[in-house]
Amino acid sequence: MKKYISVLTIMIMIFLAACSNQNTSSAPTSNENNTQSNSITKLDEGVWPANEYTEGLPVAPGTVECAALDTEHENCNINLTGISENNYNEYMELLNQEGFSVIENVSEEIEGENYVSIGTLLSNDEKWLSISYIPNSLTIYISFDNN
């Protein structure tokens, strides 16, 4: 279980880094540590991405706030807003109907915030989904590998 929580945390961190609103200079720099990977493509906001990762997935409810495709790490991340817990539960049922099985499900009450954070790892033997839900926000990490 700890492994899945660690994997979920890493995937969310990668997604948040890919979707951050960073201003990067196009001017060359001599600092090699200051380079941005060309493998991450920011996808259109407000539109459910259509690619090999999302193919066969039901379109999630809510509004796509940010989405990114990382060709180096072979994954796609989608962050949606306007999601209720009922929307989340309905989407999980749609994924189940599409052949996805829950591998791990973790929920945690966020102290002092009066809500529950839910993390779910699913697979259909072809794709792996890591889904994180907090009120009003759903993040989906999609890969073809469980690492």
Report each predicted region and the residues it spans.
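C-terminal motif of bacterial Sec signal peptides marking the signal peptidase cleavage site
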Residues: 14-18
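An acidic-aromatic pocket/loop used at catalytic or ligand-binding sites
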Residues: 20-147
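Positively charged n-region of N-terminal signal peptides that target proteins for export
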Residues: 1-4
